[in-house]
Amino acid sequence: MAAPLALVLVVAVTVRAALFRSSLAEFISERVEVVSPLSSWKRVVEGLALLDLGVSPYSGAVFHETPLIIYLFHFLIDYAELVFMITDALTAIALYFAIQDFNKVVFKKQKLLLELDQYAPDVAELIRTPMEMRYIPLKVALYLLNPYTILSCVAKSTCAINNTLIAFFILTTIKGSVFLSAVFLALATYQSLYPVTLFAPGLLYLLQRQYIPVKVKSKAFWIFSWEYAMMYTGSLVVIVCLSFFLLSSWDFIPAVYGFILSVPDLTPNIGLFWYFFAEMFEHFSLFFVCVFQINVFFYTVPLAIKLKEHPIFFMFIQIAIISIFKSYPTVGDVALYMAFFPVWNHLYRFLRNIFVLTCIIIVCSLLFPVLWHLWIYAGSANSNFFYAITLTFNVGQILLISDYFYAFLRREYYLTHGLYLTAKDGTEAMLVLK
């Protein structure tokens, strides 16, 4: 599999290099679908200019990236294009090896359950085979050729760096490295705050890996959870303190995390926040900011309860929720959870609306620049048009993720109770998710 992966890497780098040298690079870097006030490369350049002048990059209201990012590019500004290409390649490689290991774990678990007769007798067609799972890691690595990923890289959106950190968190978690998992999760949280919700699936997987039961009365459960929480918190504290020593100031905390949570910049993007708060009376904004922000965090506990035996699927759902409900989303965020679709290709037969929802997402992606042009340049449309397509895009994503969630639970139920269900009167029964 090394040769196909190398081919994917070569093709991906070639496409990116060609686009970097084309006239499209400038156009892409200004697209509101691709960059946000948090991840815009132009804002990073302005922050670097202020730093070179001996002024805090957070003294204005323009730069909102983390201190480690600005110091990284302070030394690598001349190689920025190469940095972003390497970042994307590292993300794909990390996902490739993570899913390769995950498939081995899934197959071993499936084999054990078959030996213990935990599956119903008529579910042979639902059992996954090694041949079926062989090419899944390579399909995941095709993340590199996703148009969303390519656009994000060419625009030099710092979202790509956050994706890399999350990918390495997933890899180290699946490998069972408790310390590195905590470190990469801390880095991802430091970079964009919302990955803190990935703590729960990461912990659940590591508990599973250590054969520790997820039980409130289990002493081993609490000891391990405490150790992992301390590693994560300690890593985060060290990173934040390092940022303070670099800047000799705490200005970055309100400028980065306060900015993410309070959503003061209402520049249009593909998210749900900007239009709503642009139209709202100021004295209501704090309440509704809290209501909107809680969406990212609210689902973590019920999902942890429902999917405690399936932490990687939980992780996939949580990454999707972050990309939909975060305050400043871009297409780069969407690309990360889309990379996991091949992992769940065995759910395809249970998906109810996959064709319609795929069409909605593709059509919305094509209409974003059209409606933006009609609004901003032609003047023949207004913000309602652009927000309508944004809303449709996000509703499409929500329904798609809900469809995968339903399909996953349906397959798990069939594995235990049998594929062909019958009611008490002997007629064919229908499985309903409530």
UniProtKB/Swiss-Prot annotation:
Q: Which organism is it from?
A: Mus musculus (Mouse)
Primary location group: endoplasmic reticulum
Q: Which residues bind a 2-acyl-6-[6-phosphoethanolamine-alpha-D-mannosyl-(1->2)-6-phosphoethanolamine-alpha-D-mannosyl-(1->6)-2-phosphoethanolamine-alpha-D-mannosyl-(1->4)-alpha-D-glucosaminyl]-1-(1-radyl,2-acyl-sn-glycero-3-phospho)-1D-myo-inositol?
A: N382, N384
Task: Name the lineage.
Answer: Eukaryota, Metazoa, Chordata, Craniata, Vertebrata
Entry protein name:
GPI-anchor transamidase component PIGU
Chain ranges on the Lumenal side, renumbered to this chain: 23-78, 244-285, 372-383
Q: Which InterPro entries match?
A: PIG-U (IPR009600)
Q: In which pathway does it act?
A: Glycolipid biosynthesis; glycosylphosphatidylinositol-anchor biosynthesis
The keyword Kinase is annotated on this UniProt entry:
no
